[in-house]
Curated annotation (Swiss-Prot):
Domain comment quoted from the record: The cysteine framework is C-C.
Name of the protein: Contryphan-P
UniProt modified residues of type 4-hydroxyproline: 57
Keywords: Amidation, D-amino acid, Disulfide bond, Hydroxylation, Ion channel impairing toxin, Neurotoxin, Secreted, Signal, Toxin
Entry superkingdom: Eukaryota
A cellular component annotation (GO) from this entry: extracellular region
InterPro entries linked to this entry: Conotoxin, Contryphan_CS
A GO term, aspect molecular function: ion channel inhibitor activity
Subcellular location(s) per record: Secreted
Organism, scientific name: Conus purpurascens
Positions of disulphide bridges: 56-62
A Pfam family it matches: Conotoxin
Positions of the propeptide removed during maturation: 24-54
Amino acid sequence: MGKLTILVLVAAVLLSTQVMVQGDGDQPAYRNAAPRDDNPGGAIGKFMNVLRRSGCPWDPWCG
């Protein structure tokens, strides 16, 4: 029974080492992060944001 326990522990250590080497290691998981809302005003906010970034030709509308 003792040999089986040691064998299971060694297997667990080897598998965890393999996962750390092949995985991201200590890098943060950016792929799982929620996307940032650059346009909180919805479609209208997005349109106005595009106008502001491109140098709006319609000054009264670009607030």
